[in-house]
Amino acid sequence: MDYQVDTLTRFMTAAQSADAIACVPDLIATARDAGMMVIHVVVAFRPGHPEVSPRNPVFSALKANGMAGAGSEGAAIHPAAAARAGEPIVVKQRISPFVGTDLETLLRANSIHTLVLAGVHTSGVVLSTVRHAGDLDYRLVVVRDCCADPDAEVHAMLLDIVIAKQAAVVTTAELAGALTGRSS
C-alpha cells in the first residue's frame, strides 16, 4: 500500500526506501503464485486537491506541496510494486484505504476474509488499515520486511506491540513458507 514514488522518496531516506521496496517483488510474486488476489492501494487527488480539508494536516501538506496529484510522476506506483493487467488499484484520498473507496466491495465480492498487508508508512496506511480491517473482522497478516516508516523507533513499536495485537506479523520468507508448506 502506498508504494508510490513520492511516498518512497520524499518522506524517507534512500536507505529506508530501498529496504522498504526490496522485498515487494517477492511478496507480490508469492501472492500471485498462491492464487491470491493482489490489490494495489495508492493515494491520489484530483487537480487542486478538492478532497483535502484544511482540517487534515497530513493531506494539507501534500496539497500545499502539489503532491499526490492523480496521474503525476510522484503518485505513480513504484516499478517494483507495479500492478499487472487486471489487478485492481484502489485510489484513496484518506489514510485508510477503506474510507471512501470500493476496497470493501472488492473484498466481499471475492469472498476474501484474510488480508495480507504491507506498505509505507507503518504509522500511516499500515496502522490505519489494520485498525479498520480489524473492526470489520478480517483476519490480518502484516509483512514486516515490506513495511517502513520514516521513524524507525515508531515502526518497530507499532509492529511489535500495537499491530501484533491484531495481526500476525511475519516476514516475506515466513509468508512464502506458510503458503507453500515449507518452513523458512
Region roles according to the model:
Residues A70-V120:
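Internal catalytic-core helix/loop-beta-alpha segment
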Residues V116-G119, D137-A152:
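A short glycine-rich beta-strand->turn/loop micro-motif centered on a GG-aromatic cluster
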Residues M1-R84, Q166, A178-S184:
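Active-site acidic carboxylates
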Residues T122-T129:
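Short glycine/serine/threonine-rich phosphate/pyrophosphate-binding segments
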Residues V90, A168-L175:
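Short acidic-hydrophobic, aromatic-tinged amphipathic segments that line or gate anion-handling sites
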Residues D33-M36, S111, D137:
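Glycine-centered short loops/turns at secondary-structure junctions
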Residues V38, L140-V142, V169:
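Hydrophobic beta-strand scaffold residues
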Residues P150-I163:
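Active-site-proximal loop->helix
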